Amino acid sequence: MEFEAEHEGLTASWVAPAPQGGKGAEGRAGVADEAGHGKTEAECAEDGEKCGDAEMSALDRVQRDHGDKHTESTSRKRIEAKYMDLLVEAERENKNLRKKYNIILDVSTKILVFGTCIMFATGTLIGKGTKIQVPVCNSTNLALAFLAGFLTRHV
């Protein structure tokens, strides 16, 4: 079965996996093992736990719980699970991009502030030693640079 979902202009399509094994526990055991969690459903049941729920995707959990059933509600659950997996993946990617952006922004702000301080110190030394004034390096521009750095970081 082929499915398609759309959310905020993004479209995703996929093909539902073929049934795994027989009905009931045998089918679910094969799915749990193929998902790469190391234990079959029976082994997890012996330990009194659901097989790898924390690391399983929503689609894997639906497949484990419903096996090879092909009813309308199971198909709907598979579609919802795939959609949730896509949203989780998008959120994870968003967090990674946000981290990279914050690192770049933090470094650029530090370069701006420290560079302005160095320019101010250099301009002051040049101005005192040789009577040459460097117009870029005065206290007004230093204050503006600090303000710009602060606004860039916090807005």
Curated annotation (Swiss-Prot):
Which N-terminal stretch is annotated as signal sequence? Answer: none
- State the organism of origin: Gallid herpesvirus 2 (strain Chicken/Md5/ATCC VR-987)
Q: Which UniProt keywords apply?
A: Coiled coil
InterPro entries xrefs: Herpes_pp38
Superkingdom per UniProt: Viruses
The biased composition feature labelled Basic and acidic residues covers 34-50
Question: Which gene name belongs to this protein?
Answer: MDV008
Q: Which residues form a coiled coil?
A: 76-107
Stored Pfam families: Herpes_pp38
Keyword NADP applies: no
Query: Coiled coil: present as a keyword of the record?
Result: yes
Got any disulfides in this one, which pairs? none
Location of region: Disordered = 1-50
| UniProt protein name | Phosphoprotein pp24
